[in-house]
Every structure is written in structure tokens, then in C-alpha cells.
Amino acid sequence: MIARRLIQSATPLEEAGLLQVQAVGVRAPFFFPLGMPRDEVEQVLCDILKPDQWHYYEIPQTAVRSEDVVADCGAAEGLFTLTVAHRCRHVFAIKPAPAFVKALGRTLAGLANVSILPYALAESDGAVRLSAGGITSRVTDAGDGQVVPSRAIDSLFIRQGRRVDYLKADLEGAEISMLRGAIETIRACAPRIAITTYHRREHAEQIAALLRDIHPDYHIFVKGIMPQDGRPVMLHAWMDDAA
């Protein structure tokens, strides 16, 4: 299996309740909750490290720059934050599930320009329920999930005087809700955006329409095709002065 060749070592840290994973070709280790199934770890690494995957966020028009403040929405295992932290001003890594927030803290330890925000992202502030889906847990109406605090991007950023120059998002289907809670920030900052669209068939068109409603001059580029049903994988958006 290709993913297995991406794992150099996997070391349980029993006292910390974490699994330390060294990926081939990545200098820093990743940390996952100790009980995370091996096949899920392998799939995560496959998605982010295989060269033929469409699950990458930077293209020339949406590349991270040295003065950028980056919102990593759905920071997951922390690879995107690790990749860009050394070449931007600051990264806010946002992830709600407590077990993964703890793991993310170990993965990103020592990076002075990284802040972890332990929230789900939604249209408004409050609380949401997460499914028990591990790293791919998502907002659910089912009664057996974990309740976590939710925040709107606008509450975390523009209303606190923080700008956002780059917005990266993979929220397991909650992307539209996040964007509706980010309208003030997007209107004020016009960030470059890279956002997943494959969780729901209709999201590529809906996200493009929402962004152009906020800023009609946004350029939109959609890339990648899910082999199962042809859904696009990623949407990139940028303004002319960001090209």
C-alpha cells in the first residue's frame, strides 16, 4: 500500500496519550491521538503527501506570502501549518476536537508564530456537536457526538482587529457555514482562499457564488475530480492585486 511507504516510524507515547508518526520526507514528526486507527493515519498521509493528489492548497495565484496572516481552518494533522509557518507572519491553526487539539499542540510546539484556536467554525458563535469520526469528525445533528464551542471567523478575526490574508479550509462539509460566518472578514480583507469542495456535490458552485456575492471581482479556479462521481476537489479564489 502506498500510504504505508509514507510512514517511516510510528511510536506510541503512552503517558502522553499520543502516537508520534514520522513521515518519509517530512522533517518534523506528526502527533495523533493514541487510539487513532493506523489505517486512518495512513489515509491522511496518503491524501497530503502523494504527488498525484489534488488535495493541495497553493497554486501560483494562491501562494502564501511572507507578510500573510493565515487562517488554517480545519488544521487536522498540522501539515499545512507546518509547511507555511516559516514563510509567513502568523498562522492561526483552527481545530475543534479536544484530542486533536492536544496532538496539534505537540506537532506545532516551538513555532512562535502559530496560535491554535480550539473551535469549530460556523455561521455564528455557540456550540455544535461533532461526530465520532476521528480526524474527519464533522458537525452533526445526531445525539451521540461531542459538543464543542463554535465561533464565526468574523468573531475570531475582523471583530478583534485581526486581518486574514490567506484562508485555507477543509471542514468536512461545513465550508459554507464557515464562509457565511466570515463575510465581514472576507469583505474587509479579500484574502486569497483555498477551500475544499469535494465533501458535497453542490459546494463548488455554491462557494463560487457566495464569494462573488461578497467580492464580484474574485477570480475562481476549481481543480481536481473525485473519481467516484466527478465532484471537484478544491476551489481557489483571489483578487487581481493578489495574482
What are these regions (language model features)?
Residues 1-243:
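Phosphate/nucleotide-binding beta-alpha loop and adjacent structural elements of enzyme active sites
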